[in-house]
Every structure is written in structure tokens, then in C-alpha cells.
């Protein structure tokens, strides 16, 4: 990741998401509904739901919206049945892309995802074509200036797999998915605040893109993220 600012990339991504807040709320409501349906409405027993609600709070979503989404998931209110689907593909210079969706119409979703790839210079791949290039893990990012020694001690004691110091001074904590909430709680109780905390498909290595390639790749990623059925887009491209 040398030469690329993890911190700048995250801040840029958050800024773009803030511009699309209404769409972000819609995606979060779907995630909360599915999480509650799969694991119940108890946050202490449902880490996926807790993470979705944390993201909703970060996006300033009203609590009434959150509660209605939970009730739709648990069956207290009538709701739509969503299916989880993952698509894989390629962008510029063979960079890998994973597209995670929640949909009530698989035919519509695959057509829209394929169109976004084709229109913006990418290609859809087959199942498993790029997933092996990523690791499913908990991921937390901390601003430059965060105490490395303190974060490392707290995180590793709580069960984190690794604490990475990036060239820009930001710190990244990686956890096994089942231990994400436990590590997050320990870090929070130590008075340290993550700027990003999520469960993600993290690339094992990154492909550096610059100039026109980076611009084209960003356009492709934006097109995919803007689709209503798309929840998350992951890539191994460093832009």
C-alpha cells in the first residue's frame, strides 16, 4: 500500500457517501431488516444487526426508521423478503471487484449489475473468480496520531489478528469476523475512536491505478454503488 493514503481514500469515500445520504439510508434499512430477520432483534445476540445500527447512527438515520426496519425483519411489521447475492468481476488493469446485493428480484439485479460493468469498461466474472483475492474480516481504521502502542495492546489482547501502521500514519485493526464486536468494545472502552468500523472483504494485495485508469475505475465503482440493490462494493484497486 506504499504510495497510497489509506486515510485519504477512506475520507474520500465517506464524503461521497454523505452526498448520497438518502440512498445510504435505503441500503441501511434493507441491511437492518435482513439482519433482524436472520438473527433476531436482540443486539447483544446479533452482531450483524448491531453493526448495521451503528452504521445507521453514523449516517444520522432517525431511530424511528431503525426500529421499523427491525420490526419488518422480526415480522412485527409486514416487509419485503430480500435475497443476498454476490457478483464478482473486473475493472481497469484486471482489478478485482466484489458486489454484494440485497434484492427482491434477482433477474433485475443481475441485469443492472452487468449493465454497470459493461457500460463502464468492466467485465462480470463467474462465482469465485475474484473472491479468493479478498479476506472476510472485521476492519477498523484510526486517524493518524492515534497511539499505536495503546491501540496495539488493547486490540491484540481483545482478540484482533493484526494492527497495521500505514505510510500516512493511520492505523488499521483486523479481526476475525466472530470477534469483531468484542474487539470494537474493548477499543471503545479504552477511549479510542475508530473512524471506520465494519465487516468487509479486504484485499490481500492491492493494484495501483493512476490517471485515466483510476478515473475510469472510480466511475465504474460509483455506477455499481449507485444501484438500488447494491449494498457494498469491494475492490483491490488502490486509487
Curated annotation (Swiss-Prot):
Belongs to the TACO1 family. It comes from Polynucleobacter asymbioticus (strain DSM 18221 / CIP 109841 / QLW-P1DMWA-1) (Polynucleobacter necessarius subsp. asymbioticus). This is Probable transcriptional regulatory protein Pnuc_0618. Residues 1-21 are annotated as: Disordered. It is found in: Cytoplasm. It comes from the Bacteria. One of its GO terms (cellular component) is cytosol. GO terms for biological process: regulation of DNA-templated transcription. HAMAP family: Transcrip_reg_TACO1 (MF_00693). One of its GO terms (molecular function) is DNA binding. Keywords: Cytoplasm, DNA-binding, Transcription, Transcription regulation.
